């Protein structure tokens, strides 16, 4: 869902073939707009010329890439993105992402450093909850940090299971 500001700005936009347009995405956990945890602001390319941009081959968090230099234009307003209905839904999606990430590492023949194997999940929680201020999102911030811990732990578990 886009807000009124973004709708008006898109309506008045004169697109250019040498530009990409980024928009701010407000992610929700249930009905709660996550303001911290590194999730907001979250500027992403949402309008682009498909003749000069393409998606990379990542299984998780695909990115747009281009062989030519493009101007990045911010469009004010925001997109409301209801990623997770609740914590149970988040766990299901994160488990899926963990399996994909492990498969991606395997395909690339990349092995996580030993320190990541033992400390990665703990650091992920610490980074999300404290460094990225998830603590200020209250219960939602703790839920996200806890699930980030399990995501990293499961990525590593699935990677080493498949070896």
Indicate residue ranges for each PLM-predicted region.
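Catalytic-site signature of metal-activated, phosphate-bearing donor transferases
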Residues: 3-163
